[in-house]
Design a protein with these regions (language model features):
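Intrinsically disordered, low-complexity, charge-rich segments with an acidic bias
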Residues: 7-26, 38
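N-terminal binding-site loop/beta-alpha segment at the start of enzyme catalytic domains
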Residues: 60, 65, 69-154, 222
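N-terminal small/glycine-rich loop or linker at the start of catalytic domains
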Residues: 85-101, 157-171, 195, 200
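Conserved beta-strand positions
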Residues: 95, 127, 158, 198-201, ...
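Active-site mouth loops of central-metabolism enzymes
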Residues: 97-108, 166-179, 202-203, 207-208
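Short, acidic/polar
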Residues: 105-117, 175-191, 239-244
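Active-site groove signature of glycoside hydrolases
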Residues: 188-208
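Beta/alpha (TIM)-barrel catalytic core signal, keyed to glycine-rich beta->alpha loops juxtaposed to Asp/Glu
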Residues: 208-398
Length: 399
């Protein structure tokens, strides 16, 4: 089934009859293309993954378990990976609302982006209470409802810590049981869903015992408001403490971490989290392009209409380009030169590099235009277009 069958016109809602017919067609195609017809395919750097194949071709899987289904939308063969040791399969490329939703782009473009993401096989949409002070979640929720995406076909996340208001009061931020609970309820309302598939502690909270946070997350899971909880930018020691508390008290342990990961920022995932990932921790990584640095767009300076040039993003510009990381731009330029020599888009090559890590469950993409998103999705094809010698050159360019 081509993507247009679900969203033949993104500007017009479907009728119930059309939606039901499309759902039935998908179900029939899925039954016809189970792993009993699949060809096994070896793929370096990919674990627990299901590759989508064209509807008119034989489906194939990469390290997939028995009974998994392969399918494809449009020209991109989306890859699906298990979230760590859970049974949840996320699209290897996901879509996030950081910086853009509720701030840089309008509702119409947000609608086009989510529709394009869905049509190309993305099933995980990432968000947080702090993004545009809650407006990003509101816009995403409105768009998903407007597009009438089937709730059992996608996953949505939120993150808690920073708060969703300017100058938050003490109980409006952090990881206390109160704020973890209040923020969850607010996210559910803004996103127009009855539960969050993934719920992250956006940062560690030095003012709240980890035990209290673990208990709060476990309570939300038992209430059916959250399916999996995790962390973002916690230290390995803090994660191990949370896991130990959960095991000791028979609570739900964190299932995933959301760290920054790219060619210029790799130590935490590859070294600090290594043993945790081996034990089954999933990761949904952010900033695969180092806030655009690895695309080459900042090689000649920061344009006013770029992400780093947006009003209020001076802190991000300082972090990406400024001291003590001044050498980052030099390394990014070297990477872009290698990409050109390999005949690859720098953005696609950088994202594909992230996908080669078997401990990466999903790479969160950000985009302000559909053309950006579609280019980034091409990273799935880049995986097969670069040989070992080429990847070695990529590695050496950023060391």
């Amino acid at each position: 089934m081509q993507a247009e069958a679900f969203h033949a016109d993104h500007n017009q809602p479907q009728t119930d009859t059309d939606e039901s017919a499309d759902h039935d067609a998908c179900a029939v195609q899925a039954v016809l293309r189970t792993d009993s017809r699949a060809e096994e395919r070896s793929m370096q750097g990919v674990a627990h993954a299901t590759r989508c194949a064209a509807p008119d071709a034989t489906a194939y899987t990469a390290h997939a378990g028995p009974g998994q289904v392969s399918w494809r939308l449009r020209e991109f063969a989306m890859l699906y990976r298990r979230l760590g040791s859970t049974g949840l399969q996320l699209s290897a490329l996901s879509f996030g609302a950081w910086v853009t939703f509720g701030k840089q782009i309008g509702r119409s473009e947000a609608r086009n982006l989510i529709a394009a993401a869905w049509d190309n096989g993305i099933n995980f949409f990432d968000n947080a209470e702090v993004y545009a002070r809650g407006r990003a979640e509101q816009v995403m929720g409105d768009v998903i409802a407007d597009l009438r995406l089937p709730r059992d076909g996608f996953c949505v996340s939120s993150k808690v810590f920073f708060g969703a208001v300017d100058s938050p009061r003490p109980t409006q931020r952090g990881l206390s049981r109160k704020h973890v609970t209040d923020a969850c309820h607010a996210a559910l309302k803004r996103l127009h869903v009855e539960y969050l598939d993934l719920y992250y502690c956006h940062r560690p909270d030095p003012d709240t015992p980890i035990q209290e946070t673990v208990r709060a997350m476990d309570a939300l899971i038992r209430q059916g408001k959250v399916l999996y909880w995790g962390t973002s930018e916690w230290s390995a020691a803090q994660l191990r403490e949370a896991i130990a508390i959960a095991e000791r008290e028979h609570l739900h342990a964190p299932a995933m971490e959301q760290p920054q990961y790219n060619l210029l920022h790799r130590e935490r995932l590859e070294r600090e989290y290594a043993s945790l990932c081996e034990d089954g921790l999933g990761t949904t990584i952010w900033s695969p392009l180092a806030s655009g640095l690895l695309t080459g767009k900042y090689n000649a300076g920061v344009e006013a209409d770029s992400r780093l040039g947006q009003p209020g993003n001076q802190w991000l510009q300082d972090e990406v380009l400024g001291a003590p990381e001044a050498r980052r731009l030099e390394r990014a330029r070297a990477f872009c030169a290698v990409a050109a020599e390999l005949g690859q888009s720098p953005a696609q090559l950088a994202i594909a590099w992230c996908l080669r890590n078997p401990h990466v469950s999903s790479v969160i993409l950000g985009a302000s235009r559909v053309t950006q998103l579609e280019e980034n999705l091409g990273a799935l094809n880049t995986l097969d277009q670069v040989d070992d010698a080429g990847w070695a050159r990529v590695e050496s360019s950023t060391r």
